[in-house]
Amino acid sequence: MKKVFLIFSTLIVISLSVFAQEIKFRIDGKPYNKQIYDENNNQITNFKNWELIQDFYISPDNKKMLVYHRPDKAKAFLMTLYNLETKKIIAECEPGWACNDVKWTKNYLIKVWGTSGGGIRFEYRSYEDLSIVRVVNSYYPFEDVEGNILIDPDSMMKKIVFYHYSDGTEIKTIDCIKELANKKIYAGWIQINEVKKIGKRKYKFYIEGNLNIEGRQEEEFKTVIEIEIKCEL
């Protein structure tokens, strides 16, 4: 078994909005015929009249562009992925729900959106056809891009789940009740209030709750647990 020392430059996830790329790419044209152009005035998109361009995102290497748009009179939005070198469409799909952000990794495009239930959904989509390969859901996700870690502190299920940010695969799940019992705190219900990064893949979790001890169920507690993630092959 070898320890995996992830290289920041290859696994970093970067989210770029249209504002970060407004110098190189822009939405322009007549009111009824908006298109996206690059800095050399090359037209990238070829939408029909009255197409609504809600947003677009450029990959860190400037080789791909994802456009979130809706054709005139259509009920649903579309996501279209372009190859900026060939100016051709790679893939297109109807994502079904809103697109609040897009993140780019080596192997996956991550569509991020807020669900109707209040949580955040990370959809890991293939660059080839935009199909969903993997999904991570969390009410209060903690994103450590530099460490390639995505954390789901799930108070309801009394657990903390760690994922690789770059591909959404699960690394480790911590049972909070067992972790607290190791500190001689026998908890009934818990609430994870805050997560802080305190080192390289090392995190501090601020937890409060009630005891699960006969006659002491009304007693409250506050504590902190620290967890360090060591990735192994």
Where are these predicted regions, by residue range?
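Sec/Tat signal peptide C-region and signal peptidase I cleavage site
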Residues: 16-20
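Blade-terminus and WD-like Trp-Asp/Gly-His loop motifs, strongest in beta-propeller folds
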Residues: 56-64, 101-109, 142-149, 189, ...
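Hydrophilic extracytoplasmic domains
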Residues: 23-25, 190-233
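Surface-exposed loop/turn elements that mediate protein-protein interactions on large endomembrane-trafficking
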Residues: 32-47, 77-92, 119-136, 160-182, ...
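Short glycine/acidic-enriched loop and turn motifs that connect beta-strands
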Residues: 71-75, 115-119, 156-158, 210-214
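Residue position within the beta-strands of beta-propeller blades
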Residues: 26, 67-68, 111-112, 152, ...
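N-terminal "mature head" segments of proteins
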Residues: 21-61
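Sec-dependent N-terminal signal peptides
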Residues: 4-14
